A protein has these predicted regions:
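A short, acidic/glycine-rich surface segment
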Residues: 33-36, 65-70
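Vicinal oxygen chelate
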Residues: 1-3, 7-15, 36, 47-50, 57, 70-90, 117, ...
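Residues at alpha-helix termini
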Residues: 26-27, 74, 98
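A structural feature that tracks compact, well-ordered secondary-structure segments
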Residues: 11-15, 23, 54-61, 70, ...
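Short solvent-exposed loop/turn micro-motifs enriched in small/polar/acidic residues
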Residues: 40-42, 64, 111-112
Length: 136
């Protein structure tokens, strides 16, 4: 329907990022994240590991009341988000709206050189679904 080509990344919400990193790095066979960053607008600190072509992200809140903070307070730590690559986020949003999917974003958000948008989690079995440019 929207041309999903692959999973881009999966996000795990954690309270204590350094502790979670130590735990997961051992399992993943990694000495350190492939990428670390802070996204001030989303109020998250992220450690990303690549497993094949898929990003596996551990993320913690950098601000009280952020989406990650609220998620952990409501549900505890765990899988928060699955992101799918699509050829064109703008047209995917239009198609999803036409097919009665509940969107958080009516217009794409932009980070670095990518457009992305979120679907509401409740109708998606409690999972926050992200669509992001990059699928060809």
């Amino acid at each position: 329907m929207i041309g999903i080509t692959q999973i881009d990344h999966i996000c795990i919400a954690v309270r204590d990022l350094p502790k979670a990193m130590g735990h997961w790095e051992k399992l993943l066979g990694k000495e350190k994240p492939d990428l670390e960053y802070i996204h001030d607008e989303e109020a998250i600190q992220v450690a990303r590991y690549f497993v094949g072509e898929v990003g596996f992200e551990l993320m913690c809140s950098t601000r009280e009341g952020s989406d990650v903070d609220r998620f952990i307070k409501k549900r505890g730590e765990g899988v928060m988000l699955v992101s799918f690559k699509v050829p064109d986020t703008v047209s995917a949003i239009e198609t999803l709206n036409e097919n009665n999917y509940e969107m958080i974003d009516k217009e794409p958000r932009i980070w670095e050189d990518s457009k992305f948008a979120f679907l509401k989690p409740r109708p998606m079995n409690g999972v926050l679904v992200e669509i992001i440019d990059g699928g060809n």
